[in-house]
Amino acid sequence: MASTEGANNMPKQVEVRMHDSHLSSDEPKHRNLGMRMCDKLGKNLLLSLTVFGVILGAVCGGLLRLASPIHPDVVMLIAFPGDILMRMLKMLILPLIISSLITGLSGLDAKASGRLGTRAMVYYMSTTIIAAVLGVILVLAIHPGNPKLKKQLGPGKKNDEVSSLDAFLDLIRNLFPENLVQACFQQIQTVTKKVLVAPPSEEANTTKAVISMLNETMNEAPEETKIVIKKGLEFKDGMNVLGLIGFFIAFGIAMGKMGEQAKLMVEFFNILNEIVMKLVIMIMWYSPLGIACLICGKIIAIKDLEVVARQLGMYMITVIVGLIIHGGIFLPLIYFVVTRKNPFSFFAGIFQAWITALGTASSAGTLPVTFRCLEDNLGIDKRVTRFVLPVGATINMDGTALYEAVAAIFIAQMNGVILDGGQIVTVSLTATLASIGAASIPSAGLVTMLLILTAVGLPTEDISLLVAVDWLLDRMRTSVNVVGDSFGAGIVYHLSKSELDTIDSQHRMQEDIEMTKTQSIYDDKNHRESNSNQCVYAAHNSVVIDECKVTLAANGKSADCSVEEEPWKREK
């Protein structure tokens, strides 16, 4: 009793816990702010290193230009880590396109895939037309071209003319490759050749041909030969991205229709996609060094940078202002109008992809990084990104359309050619279509510029005058292309979210039904086994269990508590 009272009189210990927010810190607030900044930089370490690499490459390149002329081998060694980065990124393009398209489309039905593709194409065409029209308006308003520039820059190099019809037919041919393996490293192109054709009389009569040869030896003028332009199809180096995308879109849709039969293949490509994305993460940690070396090497290799900047400064400003307006105002505005979400928080999520595009100048090379930014940072459904991004990296080139429209009218202004309304519309439409057909590789805009200049009858040799500044503008327009693809994925995901949720609920219901069927089959099997176990001793009156005899009841299912030891046990 005394012990009980002593226990009751003991002081009770009460543990009081307070939330961290109620505790005052002795550390100054500015230190907390600094620690928060360090924590944020730590979480975004890769992004911070990439931005630092861009700045470091530009600063080092500018300082090295001030030094004495650098040997080309030294420049090559400086840019070598950047070349390795580009090779690694391009190495992943093919497996990433294959796995992403198949896994994205196999999880959708045919109707959902069609709606997804329609929304993406409407967005692509709309933004590309807006970019081309913006470029035309800016170049006409600023008027950077001047006939005096043509005299300062000198004549350009002669280029082969390209037919718009041939380019369009090549686009369709590449969409349907005859050999899928060959499409991984080659694409088809129409080539025009000038061939000397002898007159028919020379071909028909061998005697006259011999006489003609004798006349040539006797310094007599032979019959004139004709120059005939012949067209032919040739394969050129470069991945046929358009053909691969077309095939694997059809492959993914067909696999999605097969349902459970293709489950093993879907799992295989899902695993392949995950492996590729893990490789992407490894390469991204190398990208700050590679991007710094790429930019530094490019700046060192430029000849007469100051002279080029003075001569083509207004042209560069026109293109850059147009890209900033389109990528910084129009695209975020379209995203906000459609989704009613903050476009700048969206841009913060894709900043890593934007910086990578600025350094590599390749939409296809940036594709692995763009996948990771949209899926991990912004939480966009993989079925959307895996379909929208590969297609967008190939045909959605807003920055390229704007650049080509500005460049074409700039060349016209340099040559003193005044374009009428019809020609300006032609430039806008051709720039839109040419940007869609441009391959997602560096400096593809210069190649497609031939189409636009040929369409309005401008000299194609003047394209070579713009090569000196294309290294910078190519990076700027590629970064806008990547931003446009990313905003497009966000818009398509917002418009398709309800349909994707419906598909997910249907899949869950189907899985529940399959699980219920499996459980019922399992229960039936167990029930049959239990019945068979109960009846196994039905023909016996007693059994021996643990050295004891158990007498069974008449029904053979239960014992009447008649348990006795065996006689020899009792005798012991």
From Swiss-Prot:
It catalyses: K(+)(in) + L-glutamate(out) + 3 Na(+)(out) + H(+)(out) = K(+)(out) + L-glutamate(in) + 3 Na(+)(in) + H(+)(in); K(+)(in) + L-aspartate(out) + 3 Na(+)(out) + H(+)(out) = K(+)(out) + L-aspartate(in) + 3 Na(+)(in) + H(+)(in); D-aspartate(out) + K(+)(in) + 3 Na(+)(out) + H(+)(out) = D-aspartate(in) + K(+)(out) + 3 Na(+)(in) + H(+)(in). One of its GO terms (biological process) is telencephalon development. Residues 344-374, 424-457 dip into the membrane without crossing it. The modification Phosphoserine is found at residues 3, 21, 24-25, 505, 520, 530, 532, 542, 558, 562. Residues 1-11 have a biased composition (Polar residues). Residues 1-44 are cytoplasmic. Residues 14-28 have a biased composition (Basic and acidic residues). The modification Phosphotyrosine is found at residue 537. A lipid is attached at residue 38 (S-palmitoyl cysteine). One of its GO terms (cellular component) is membrane protein complex. L-aspartate binds at residues 361-363, 400, 441-445, 474, 481. Na(+) 2 binds at residue 394. Changing residue 38 to S: Severely impairs glutamate uptake activity. Glycosylated. Palmitoylation at Cys-38 is not required for correct subcellular localization, but is important for glutamate uptake activity. Pfam families: SDF (PF00375). Glycans are attached at residues 205, 215. Its main location: membrane. It is found in: Cell membrane. Belongs to the dicarboxylate/amino acid:cation symporter (DAACS) (TC 2.A.23) family. SLC1A2 subfamily. Homotrimer. Interacts with AJUBA. Sodium-dependent, high-affinity amino acid transporter that mediates the uptake of L-glutamate and also L-aspartate and D-aspartate. Functions as a symporter that transports one amino acid molecule together with two or three Na(+) ions and one proton, in parallel with the counter-transport of one K(+) ion. Mediates Cl(-) flux that is not coupled to amino acid transport; this avoids the accumulation of negative charges due to aspartate and Na(+) symport. Essential for the rapid removal of released glutamate from the synaptic cleft, and for terminating the postsynaptic action of glutamate. This is Excitatory amino acid transporter 2.
